[in-house]
Amino acid sequence: ETIELETVLAGLLDEACKRGIIEDSIVYRDLFDTKIMNCLTPRPAQVQAEFAKRYEVSPKEATDYFYKLSQDSDYIRRYRVKKDRKWKVDSAYGEIDITINLSKPEKDPKAIAAAKNAKASSYPKCQLCVENEGYAGLVNHPARENHRIIPITVNDSAWGFQYSPYVYYNEHCIVFNGEHTPMKIEKQTFVKLFDFVKLFPHYFLADLPIVGGSILSHDHFQGGNYTFAMAKAPMEETFTIKNFEDVEVGIVKWPLSVLRLRSTDESRLIELGAHILDAWRGYTDEAAFVFANTDGEPHNTITPIARKVGDTYELDLALRNNITTEEHPLGVYHPHAQWHNIKKENIGLIEVMGLAVLPSRLKEEMEILADYLVEGKNIRENEKIEKHADWVETFRGKYDGFTKENVMEILEKEVGIVFTNVLEDAGVYKCTEEGRIAFKRFIETL
C-alpha cells in the first residue's frame, strides 16, 4: 500500500514538536520538513545531468522528469495545490478558468511577529535569486533546500529554469536571470522569449510588466505547458503591416486588446514586436482615452506571450495602459470598484490569458453566501458577506430560486461573469464597434 508523503512528514513533524526541536506552527513545520526532504533529493549536479541526458531524447522528456522531481521532493507541495478550488465558465470569449488559491499557507500571528523582529537579510536578495537553491530559509523567507534549478542560456547569458511552488496551472515554470537585475521590456525581451521557446517548444513563455502583481526587481518570465483560453481564441480579422508582409497579424477575439503575430521565422516576430512596442509606447489617441504619458509619467506597455504551434511561432501582444483618474484611482484599465468584492488585486499575466486567480477569502464567503441564498437570509446583516449584497441583486432575478443543489453552480457561474467583466475593464480598446475602430487607428500607424 502507498502512504502519502504528507502523512509521513506530518508524523515526523509532530514528533519534532513533541521533542521541542521545533515550534508547532506552519512556518516552522515547513522549514523543518524541507530540511528533511533535502536529505532525499538528488544533488543539483545530479539533477542537471539527468535532465541533460533526457533532453537528448526530447525536451518534453526532460521537463516531465524535472516536473515530477519538483513534486516528489515536496518543493511543490502537491497536497496543498490540490486544495485549490478550480472550475471553468463559458463566456463570449471561450472557456475561462477560475481558481481560488488556497495553497499559499496563511501565516500565524507568532511567525508574523518573529518575522517583524528578524533583522533584514540581503541574502538571497529575493525569492527568485539563484542563491535560493539549497537555502535553509528564515521565518520571513521560505526554505529552499529541496529546490533545484536547471541552468539555461537565454540571449547569450546565464539564466535559470524552475517550477513555481504554487502551480497555478500545469507545469507552471519561472525562467529568471542569473543576475538580480530589474525587469524591463525592450526588443531583447522578445529575443529571450523565443530563445526559451526554441529550447522547449511545448512550453509558452510570457513577460510580466509592472502592471501585474509579481517580483519586479528581478528580471524573469513565466511559462508552462498549458493552453489558456486566450491561446485558443481566434483572430477576428487580419492585417498586413508594411515591410512585414510575410507576417500574419490580427486582432484576437479577447476582452483585452491583443495583437497576434504569426510566422515560421521567429526573427521576424522579434523585429515586428519591437516596432509595435515602440509605436505603442509613444501612442496617444485622446478620443479613445489613450495617453502615452501625463506629467512625464509613461503609461503604455505591452504584455508579450510567445509560443510555438506546429511549425509556426506566435507572439501575442496585449496592449496595456495604467493611467488613473479621480473616478478610477487604481486605474482606468484596471478592475473597476463595482467588482472589488471578487477581485481587487491587479490583473497579472495569468489573468490576462484567461485564468482568474482569486483570493482565498472567497471560498468561505461563497459558502456563507450559498447558505444565506438558500435560507433566504439577509446578506447585508453578515459582515463577512455584506460586500456581496449589491452583486447578488444584479443576478438574483435571473434564476427561479436557490436550492442546495443549484446554488454553488450559480455562484460559480456568476463569479465567472464578473471575471469576464474585470478583463473587459482592463481592455484598452473595448469589444464594440467604436472600440474596434479606435484599435484600427493604432494599427494604421504601424
Write out the residue ranges for each language-model feature.
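Amphipathic alpha-helical segments that form well-ordered structural scaffolds
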Residues: 192-196, 275, 418
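Helical scaffold of the NTase/Pol beta-like nucleotidyltransferase catalytic core
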Residues: 145-148, 181-205
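Catalytic or ion-translocation cores adjacent to nucleophile or general acid/base/metal-coordination motifs
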Residues: 184, 198-215, 223-275, 281-284
